[in-house]
Amino acid sequence: MKNFLYTSLFFLALNINAQLIDYELYTLDNGLDVILHQENSSPVVTVSVMYHVGAKDEVDGRTGFAHFFEHLLFEGTKNIERGKWFDIVSSNGGSNNANTSHDRTYYYETFPSNSLELGLWMESERMLHPIINQIGVDTQNEVVKEEKRQRIDNAPYGALIYGTAVDPYLYKKHPYRRSIIG
């Protein structure tokens, strides 16, 4: 009982010192939620978009599509040539990445603070004007297969870390039993 009390007090003390993050939340007419948070300690801006779609939305026997589309949406848009996404980001002093989980797919770009409009434009391009063609499908299919080989198939404990060895047993009927990577 004494250990429980000390543990509880420890976690209570952590919560007392936790900082609340100030943000503004807007819901646009199209249903898009926009969260704004200003933090002036670094001269950078991050534009991120989270889509509420992930591996849980797939069907048994056909997994990995959310992750695959995460990759495809870097292939180019109506106004961004194929293969130029990363060039635009890096030539403007930025970095970017994306990831997929059971519940969502997340993209972000971090730029110097004077490039907010560029980040917003790039994410709007990804959302409104993606180009998905056979070249991109073939390219990203190989990229995703290589990612699976590196992270799961050929990595010690990879199947444990990425859940492919455990999740089907933990979540017998729940959508989380499906592999994210495919």
Language model features by range: what are they?
Residues 51, 77-78, 84-182:
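Acidic/histidine-enriched segments that form metal/cofactor-coordinating
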Residues 12-14, 33, 141-142:
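Residue-level marker of intrinsically disordered, low-complexity segments enriched
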Residues 17-86, 108-111, 117-127, 181-182:
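His/Glu-rich zincin catalytic helix
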Residues 9, 74, 154:
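Active-site-proximal flexible loops/turns
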Residues 3-16:
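Sec-dependent N-terminal signal peptides
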